[in-house]
Amino acid sequence: VNAVRVATLDRAGVMLVFDGDIILGARSHKLSESKLDAFGPINWGLLGEVRIDIRFSDSAKARHDRPLQFQPGFESRIGVYTLFPGFPPSELVANIERGNIRGMVLNAYGSGNISYIYLDAIRLATDKGIAVVVTTQCLEGATLMHLYDVGRQALNSGVIQAYDMSKECIITKLMWALKRTSNLDEIQKIMHTNYTGEINVEGKLYGAKT
C-alpha cells in the first residue's frame, strides 16, 4: 500500500518502498533475508520515509514532462569474479581466451586494490576488447585505484573503476552498456555517467541525506 501511495506522488525515478523507507532503486541492496527492514541504501541516504504522511528528502526529484527514452537490451555474457588470496590469474585468462565473455567485474579488496599478478590478465582482456570493471568487496565505500602503483597500472591498462556504485548496479549497467557499444572508451563513459544518482565519480559519498 505504501508503495502505491508513493507512486502516485510527484516524484520521479525508480524507488523501492519497504518498511516505511523510500530508497533510490539504483542504490538499494538487500541486507537481510528475514528482517522487516530487509533493504537499505548503499552509499546514499533515504529518499524519504512513509510515516503518517510521506516525507521526501531534498534529493528526491520532481517528475518532468519530457518523453521517455526507452532503450532496452542487455548483454548477458559477462563474468563476475571475487578475488581472494590464492585466486589464480589463470582462471581469468581461461575465461578471456574462451572468447565467450564481453565484460568482467572484479570484486577487489578495500578501495579497489588488486595484486600485481592480475595485471597481465587485465591487459589481455582489454586488448581483446573485453571491458573490465573493478569494484570493492566492501558493502560501503568507493574505489580509489589511483592510491597505489598497481591500481594506477590497472587504470592505465584500461580498467574501469566502479567508484561508489552498488554491485547490483555495476552488473546491470555494464550489461546495458555492452548492448550499446563495443568501444571500451564509450563503455567507460557510460559507466561513469550518472543517470539516476547511481554513481558519484567525485568521491563524495552519502550525498543524499534525509
Please provide the spans of the model-predicted regions.
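Short coil/turn connectors at secondary-structure junctions
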Residues: 9-13, 18-19, 75-78, 100-102, ...
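Accessory alpha-helical/coil subdomains and C-terminal extensions
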Residues: 24-112, 193-210
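C-terminal non-catalytic interaction/assembly regions of soluble proteins
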Residues: 111-210
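Short beta-strand segments
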Residues: 15-19, 82, 107, 135-136
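Short, glycine-/small-residue-rich phosphate/pyrophosphate-handling segment
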Residues: 1-20, 24-28, 160-161, 183, ...
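Hydrophobic helix-cap positions at the C-terminus of alpha-helices
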Residues: 6-7, 95, 125
